From Swiss-Prot:
It comes from the Bacteria. GO terms for cellular component: cytoplasm. Binds 2 [4Fe-4S] clusters per subunit. One cluster is coordinated with 3 cysteines and an exchangeable S-adenosyl-L-methionine. Belongs to the radical SAM superfamily. Lipoyl synthase family. This is Lipoyl synthase. Pathway: Protein modification; protein lipoylation via endogenous pathway; protein N(6)-(lipoyl)lysine from octanoyl-[acyl-carrier-protein]: step 2/2. It catalyses: [[Fe-S] cluster scaffold protein carrying a second [4Fe-4S](2+) cluster] + N(6)-octanoyl-L-lysyl-[protein] + 2 oxidized [2Fe-2S]-[ferredoxin] + 2 S-adenosyl-L-methionine + 4 H(+) = [[Fe-S] cluster scaffold protein] + N(6)-[(R)-dihydrolipoyl]-L-lysyl-[protein] + 4 Fe(3+) + 2 hydrogen sulfide + 2 5'-deoxyadenosine + 2 L-methionine + 2 reduced [2Fe-2S]-[ferredoxin]. [4Fe-4S] cluster 2 binds at residues 90, 94, 97. Its main location: cytoplasm. It is found in: Cytoplasm.
Amino acid sequence: MATVIDTLKARGSEDRAARHPEKQNRPDTPVLRKPEWLRVRAPGSGQYNETKGIVREHKLHTVCEEAACPNIGECWSQKHATMMIMGEICTRACAFCNVTTGLPTQLDPDEPRRVAEAVAKMGLKHVVITSVDRDDLLDGGARHFAEVVTSIRAAAPGTTIEILTPDFLRKDGAENVVIDSKPDVFNHNLETVPRLYLKIRPGARYYNSLRLLDRVKQRDPSQFTKSGLMVGLGETKEEVMQVMDDMRSAGVDFITIGQYLQPTRKHAAIDRFVTPEEFKAYEAIARAKGFLMVSSSPLTRSSHHAGEDFAKLQAARRALDARTA
C-alpha cells in the first residue's frame, strides 16, 4: 500500500513546503460556527509574548502553534508550552490534524539540549513533550525522544516530564527506549473510536495504540499512563464507553475527552458540537469505570492544565494506595 511519503516522493520537491499536500484534492467541507462555550480570547499578554520569545530564541516548535490549539492564549500567558520535537513535518496525514504533512528533514542532534535549556529558562514545574510521527526513521524517533527526556532531567531536575508519543507502528521495541527514559507520564492518544479510524486516523491502528499503552504499564507500572479522545466526529455514546473500557483494560490512569475542532475546510467535518452537559456525563461515567483522573470538557486537550492535573493524579494514586494498603 502506498504511503503519504511515497506520494510526496513521486510528486517531487515542489510539494515539500505545502502544509497539507495530501488534502489539496479533497472536496471542501463546511466549517460550523462555534457555539458560545467554545469561544476564547485572542492571545496577547506580556507573559504570552515572553513565552513566544523563549520558543523563538531556542528555535523550537510547539504543538500549540502547529495544531492551532484554542488554548494557546491561556497556556502561554501562564508560561506553559508543549514542545513538539523531531521537526514540524509529519509523515502521517490524519484527517483531524493541522500539523504539516510531508518529507521531514534530518533530526537535529542539538534539539534535546535546546529543549532542556528552554524548560529551565521558563522555570517549568511540569513540561509536556510531543512530536510529529517519523515513520521514515528506523526507530520512529524513539532514541531522540529519550534523549530529550534525559536532557531535561539534567537541566531541570525539579521538573516533572510528560510525553505524548506517536504509536511507533512497526518499530519493534522502539517504545521500550522511551519507557526506559523514565518520564513521569506516558501519554498516547487513541483519538477516536475504532469504527472511525480509517476515516480519521488512516495511518494508525486502534489496537496497536491500545497495545502500546498496555506495554508501558507492563514494563513500568510506576509510570502514569494517559490517553485522549476527541468527540463530535460521529461517534456514539456507546462507542465512547467501549473506548473507556478498552483503556481501563490497558491500565490507563488518566483519560482526556475534548471537542474536535476542524482546522480547515479540507479536514474532517465536525459532526456536531457536544454540549458541556454531555462532557460532564462522560466524566462521571469515566470516574465510575475507575480512572484515577478524568478531564472532560469542550476545550480539554492533552496538555491543557497538565501540571495541575499531574498533581491531582499523584494525589489520586496516593489515596488509592492508602485505601488498598
